[in-house]
């Protein structure tokens, strides 16, 4: 699997976990609240792990790729603001 595909898969997993954080209904009973609290702790731990892996992927890329990515982001923001 190429580096780009690994990075995209990590981002996809991250977004799935973030979506799960905010999608569930608000718990009503104490048991549901305890379960929800544990699920939140688990998901936040998953997010921290994925953030670390994403950061590692970014840092493992060469400085040229990183600079090019930052330049592309700046150009995209500039074109969005002009529209």
UniProtKB/Swiss-Prot annotation:
Its main location: host cell. A motif (Nuclear localization signal and RNA-binding (RRE)) lies at residues 29-45. This is Protein Rev. It comes from Simian immunodeficiency virus (isolate GB1). GO terms for biological process: mRNA transport. Escorts unspliced or incompletely spliced viral pre-mRNAs (late transcripts) out of the nucleus of infected cells. These pre-mRNAs carry a recognition sequence called Rev responsive element (RRE) located in the env gene, that is not present in fully spliced viral mRNAs (early transcripts). This function is essential since most viral proteins are translated from unspliced or partially spliced pre-mRNAs which cannot exit the nucleus by the pathway used by fully processed cellular mRNAs. Homomultimer; when bound to the RRE. Multimeric assembly is essential for activity. Keywords: Host cytoplasm, Host nucleus, mRNA transport, RNA-binding, Transport. The gene is rev. GO terms for cellular component: host cell cytoplasm; host cell nucleolus. A motif (Nuclear export signal) lies at residues 65-76. Disulfide bonds: none annotated. The RNA-binding motif binds to the RRE, a stem-and-loop structure present in incompletely spliced viral pre-mRNAs. This region also contains the NLS which mediates nuclear localization. These overlapping functions prevent Rev bound to RRE from undesirable return to the nucleus. When Rev binds the RRE, the NLS becomes masked while the NES remains accessible. It is found in: Host nucleus, Host nucleolus; Host cytoplasm. One of its GO terms (molecular function) is RNA binding. Residues 17-24 are annotated as: Homomultimerization.
